[in-house]
């Protein structure tokens, strides 16, 4: 049971079938697994389809962002997230490779850290597949280093394909 703690933002994505099924089912089951492990799910964005990058011929990704709470410290939480990825068949073969599940720690209550965990996530401000669902559940979020709001960050992105909300 969660004793809770600060509000934390995580991003989830998948573009390969996992033991849980197709990508959207994988995200749902991964969120349920996190909850079973004591991570309180506060809110979850809609699911979005995003073209794969850097190879758009790879299957498209399904992406979402969730606001969660846990008493785990960032390093402990990242270890837990990586464990859940592994449970769902994640293989770390190459950067940006297709994957059954990817869970990124985006923000841990506004903390700024380097080392074993970099917070906020170093590329979150450049990723529409993070910012679009993030804007849906946390429209007032501000990047702890850049000081910009999620809307400002989205407006600054080059148009590389906007994520499409899934029904």
Question: What does each of the following model-derived ranges do?
Answer:
Residues 2-10, 16-95, 100, 109-110:
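Nucleotide and nucleotide-moiety/phosphate-recognizing core
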Residues 53-60, 78, 82-167:
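Flexible, gly/pro- and Lys/Arg-enriched active-site loops
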């Amino acid at each position: 049971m969660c004793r809770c703690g600060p509000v934390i933002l995580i991003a989830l994505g998948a573009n390969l079938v996992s033991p849980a099924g197709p990508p959207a089912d994988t995200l749902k089951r991964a969120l349920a697994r996190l909850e079973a492990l004591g991570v309180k799910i506060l809110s979850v964005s809609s699911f979005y389809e995003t073209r794969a990058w850097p190879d758009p011929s790879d299957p498209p990704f399904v992406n979402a962002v969730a606001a969660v709470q846990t008493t785990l410290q960032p390093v402990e939480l990242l270890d837990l997230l990586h464990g859940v990825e592994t449970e769902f068949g994640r293989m770390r073969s190459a950067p940006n490779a297709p994957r059954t599940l990817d869970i990124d720690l985006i923000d841990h209550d506004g903390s700024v850290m380097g080392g074993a965990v970099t917070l906020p996530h170093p590329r979150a401000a450049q990723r529409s597949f993070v910012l679009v669902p993030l804007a849906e559940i946390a429209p007032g979020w501000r990047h702890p280093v850049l000081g910009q709001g999620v809307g400002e960050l989205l407006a600054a992105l080059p148009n590389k394909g906007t994520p499409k909300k899934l029904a």
